[in-house]
Design a protein with these regions (language model features):
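Hydrophobic alpha-helical transmembrane segments
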Residues: 4-7, 32, 142-147, 195-201
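Small-residue-rich helix-loop
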Residues: 112-167, 171
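Short helix-perturbing small/polar motifs within transmembrane alpha-helices
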Residues: 1-36
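Membrane-interfacial segments
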Residues: 6, 10, 39, 105-116, ...
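Transmembrane alpha-helical segments of multi-pass membrane proteins
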Residues: 16-28, 123-137, 195-198
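Membrane-interface interhelical loops and short interface/amphipathic helices
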Residues: 32-82
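Selected alpha-helical membrane-embedding segments in polytopic membrane proteins
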Residues: 63, 69-117
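Long, positively charged, glycine-interspersed low-complexity recognition regions
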Residues: 150-225
Length: 225
């Protein structure tokens, strides 16, 4: 409903995305509260349940005690990190869901003859410059303050880094997609190249760096590219 209202009242794409994501997070938080998920996370009950299931699986496996202990420690570390990153995961999920819904709804309305504002295709995606640069500056300041003053705000910094780096990587991916569509005619080859870039850790960081560069220089408009 909020997407339909914003499109029909000619709200900007950034405003509509922000409102849609906010409502998504509010709705998700309400569902988690009503189902007791938030309480289970805060009390540690959810981790206990995961650990119990993991323990049963390891006991049924033909592993030595040393291997079971090593896998249990790895699982515990991974789950603790996953719990710390839940806010970033929820925010990114909300942005993806809202973007896809917004894009599909807007395109269908345009096909139906309505003049509405909606996001352009993915290969032309560009994050709003001011919020991105402010976020990068705040994260840099927080990292410096935490390093020199030991503020113990690592979970907040980590969530912020995951969100900002992921968004910049998406922008970098859209730039790569732009040039693949321009120079690589085969859809299969384009998909293969994109898959290779995504599965290589260096490629992911390269996408984020490309997205950050695009905040200062419009990479798609470089002469001769």
């Amino acid at each position: 409903l909020i997407l339909d209202y914003c499109m029909r009242t000619d709200r900007s794409v950034d405003t509509t995305m922000a409102l849609g994501t906010l409502l998504f997070l509010v709705g998700l938080g309400f569902i988690m509260y009503r189902t007791g998920t938030i309480q289970a996370i805060e009390s540690g009950e959810l981790m206990k349940n995961f650990s119990a299931v993991q323990g049963e699986i390891l006991q049924r496996a033909s592993l030595t005690e040393a291997e079971q202990a090593r896998l249990a420690m790895t699982f515990k570390t991974t789950m603790n990190r996953a719990m710390d990153l839940l806010p970033a995961f929820f925010l990114l999920s909300g942005l993806v869901v809202v973007y896809l819904s917004y894009r599909i709804s807007g395109r269908n309305m345009r096909i139906g003859g309505e003049k509405v504002i909606c996001p352009g295709p993915f290969f032309l995606m560009h994050l709003p410059r001011v919020p991105v640069l402010i976020s990068v500056g705040l994260l840099g300041t927080a990292l410096a303050m935490n390093y020199f003053m030991a503020l113990s705000i690592e979970p907040y910094i980590l969530n912020g880094l995951v969100v900002v780096v992921s968004l910049l990587a998406c922008q970098g991916m859209s730039i790569v997609n732009f040039y693949l569509l321009r120079f690589v005619p085969s859809p299969f080859l384009r998909g293969l190249i994109m898959f290779f870039v995504l599965v290589v850790p260096v490629g992911q960081m390269g996408l984020a760096a490309l997205g950050l560069i695009d905040q200062f220089i419009d990479v798609r408009s470089i002469e001769g590219a």
